[in-house]
């Protein structure tokens, strides 16, 4: 007969709770043994930190007046450090700089600069033809020879060529130059190169950078000395004022390097007739700081293909290129002194469009033609002095020599003497007065003075913040699931062999057909099949 033994075990809810707690504690201890250690609390971190005063203010121990005073001292020191750090940062962000001057030792030979000169009068009156006067009427203010202001009927003037007009009607150096000497050697007009500027046809001495003339000594007599006749009788009469009308007499001079084009209408200085002008020069090599200390143009930016027509970048070349682009965009042509191969503007466009365009361009940092200074620049410092010429004796001599009267000599002749004061160059270099290394040094000193900290102390604090934050994130991500529990207990079904091994009471049932019945009540299974007998065992 098959026997099924069912043992119903019911636990009280009060008995189950301690067991669940014991199991939970065992699981927690097991997880703690297997998982990472819990992060240190603030008191433990403060007691081991290298930040001075933090352990006494926040470390383990009783709270009292002493700890409060330490906390106040720590906060005061921290506030003082932050104030000093902010002051240092503000000083660093102003990017202060200083200029260091270093006079170089005298050199046996120094390269002589380029000297550009222009007669202030642009057109010679005697060289102007009727067609020139007609085309240049708005530019010069001269009226056409026809009283009605128009050319004669049937007379056709050729189209004007501004380059030809300037080249033909400008003052010729061969006529102006009366004497020329360089370092004791004779020179002539062939040693000058023609260059066009806002003053028209001009001339540059020592213009070729590949064959620059050397100066072997300093002082007068070792540079360029020229005598010029400015030809005032060729100056245009003034009938009415225009933008090109000039009331001066003399020449404009600019001393510059060979790599820099002349920008003489703004950078030149005037030399008057009736005087001998002495220009003492000194070479100056300037080094400027790039961003963020200054606005100079670094070497890496100088080789851009935007300054076509010039071998090197310079402020003058940049300005001329910018002016050309503006005139070309508005007037669809360029002026004679501007680089390029575009069409030259006719005279009427000069006065109607080009001059107005140039006047509208700003030269400041906010204008469309802002040109930064190169970070490495060579310029020539000048000291100018003059004496009156000629004296009475030389006036009569020069009048006889050049077949002029003394009044003409006094009104037209001038002498220009350009020389090196000494064969030394002066180096001026901008240097950062407060750099990053100085800022870090000052911050480290203030940090050590007020809070006794260092870079490693900051790393300790960051490491502690990371440790605490990472532990909080892991707790959020790995929340344990709540186990399902029944409120009444549970029923466990055991097999016969398990029940016999675990039960303290012996079996009391008999097989089918036995004589004695079980001592347990309800020994007949109500759900058993007919003809079968089930016996219950209770423990």
Curated annotation (Swiss-Prot):
Extracellular-side positions: 90-438
This protein's name: Acid-sensing ion channel 4
GO molecular-function term, one example from the UniProt record: sodium channel activity
Keywords: Cell membrane, Disulfide bond, Glycoprotein, Ion channel, Ion transport, Membrane, Sodium, Sodium channel, Sodium transport, Transmembrane, Transmembrane helix, Transport
Top-level division of the source organism's lineage: Eukaryota
Subunit structure: Homotrimer. Heterotrimer; with other ASIC proteins producing functional channels.
Entry membrane topology: Multi-pass membrane protein
Provenance organism: Mus musculus
